[in-house]
Amino acid sequence: MILVERRRIIDAVKERGWELVPHNWAQNDLLTYYAHDPDRESAVIRRTLDKYQEVVGRPAKAWLSSALRGTPYTPAFLKEFGLIAYCDYLNDDQPYLIDTVHGPIVCVPYSNDINDFNIFARGGLSTHDGIDMLKLCFDELYGEGAVTGRIMNVGLHPHVIGQPHRIAALREFIEYVRGKTKVWFPTREQIATWYLAQAPQHIRRST
């Protein structure tokens, strides 16, 4: 677990005020392994959240399962343990409420398409083509956002986007987005907090 093994990285993230989102106890210990053993899944999540609070100094508010492999029980466990955002699902460009047995939790959707690993490492796009893809995605969502807000989640991995030529291109994309009006750069916690204050109803139940 990086919280245990890479404290200097965690300290640097905290100093910069970046959001830290728990990503399971171990990358290869998928929650789906416990799909038929909810007690074990609950224990893994609880252990992860306890260590997070010990190291980070505050409770976690959002969760992204390793490999996006949550179970039907995951949202309810997260809500039970005090989280407000669950980020595994890929099915929308807007946040929405998941109604669990412990109350609602906000789904802040993730994206596998708009993700440096799938764009470059798997997709084989050139740096310029990849950034053009990001701009096209942003432009479409920006237009739709004139009617109702949209989320553009860009998944980045240091060993992929961290190549010098890609860093320069990423900087170009960020400046492109910053040049637009009415664009918000929130954390998942901020999105969920805002959405909980706005959403009128729950739309599905996870038990």
Predicted regions and their residues:
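Metal-dependent polysaccharide deacetylase catalytic core of the NodB/CE4 family, i.e.
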Residues: M1-T71, V101-G103, P109-R122, I151-N153, ...
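Generic structural signal for well-ordered alpha-helices
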Residues: R7-D11, I45-L49, P75, F138-Y142, ...
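Anion (oxyanion) recognition and catalysis
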Residues: K14, K79, R178-G179
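Conserved beta-strand edge residues that scaffold enzyme active sites
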Residues: Q27, A67, D92, I191-A192
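Generic structural signal for helix capping and beta-alpha/helix-loop junctions
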Residues: L30, G70, P95, T193-Y195
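Alpha-helix N-cap and loop-to-helix initiation/capping positions
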Residues: H36-A43, L125-D129, H165, A169
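Active-site-adjacent pocket scaffolds in enzyme catalytic domains
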Residues: Q53-E54, R58-T148, H202-R204
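C-terminal domain-boundary segment and adjacent tail
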Residues: A85, K135-T207
